[in-house]
Curated annotation (Swiss-Prot):
One of its GO terms (molecular function) is glutaminyl-tRNA synthase (glutamine-hydrolyzing) activity. The gene is gatC. It catalyses: L-glutamyl-tRNA(Gln) + L-glutamine + ATP + H2O = L-glutaminyl-tRNA(Gln) + L-glutamate + ADP + phosphate + H(+); L-aspartyl-tRNA(Asn) + L-glutamine + ATP + H2O = L-asparaginyl-tRNA(Asn) + L-glutamate + ADP + phosphate + 2 H(+). It comes from Burkholderia vietnamiensis (strain G4 / LMG 22486). This is Aspartyl/glutamyl-tRNA(Asn/Gln) amidotransferase subunit C. InterPro entries: Asp/Glu-ADT_sf_sub_c (IPR036113), GatC (IPR003837).
Length: 99
């Protein structure tokens, strides 16, 4: 799938973006490169390959760098709310803006 300059200008118009001709041509090149990459990926035969829920686990050197999500510091609510102009029952009070 290849886009034309008219397509890029129409998309910009629909997105309410003002785009100069030079920018539109540059964007056209980038989008066509992206769609070319997508076409290459779609051309790969993946029959018989089970999808991975978390593909990063298959790369050992990357997976080992990840750590468990654990609490590393304690947040003191009173200290954080002390500079607030208005607090009630541990909640910040803000002015009503919608009727």
């Amino acid at each position: 799938m290849a886009l034309t300059l008219t397509d890029v200008k129409r998309i910009a118009h629909l997105a309410r973006l003002e785009m100069a001709d030079a920018d539109a041509e540059h964007t056209l090149g980038q989008l066509n490169e992206f769609f070319g990459l997508v076409e290459q990926m779609q051309a790969v035969d993946t029959a018989g390959i089970a999808p991975l829920a978390h593909p990063i686990e298959q790369i050992q050197e990357v997976a080992q760098r990840l750590r468990d999500d654990a609490v590393t510091e304690v947040v003191n609510r009173d200290d954080n709310q002390r500079p607030a102009p208005a607090v009630q029952d541990g909640l910040y009070l803000v002015p009503k803006v919608i009727e």
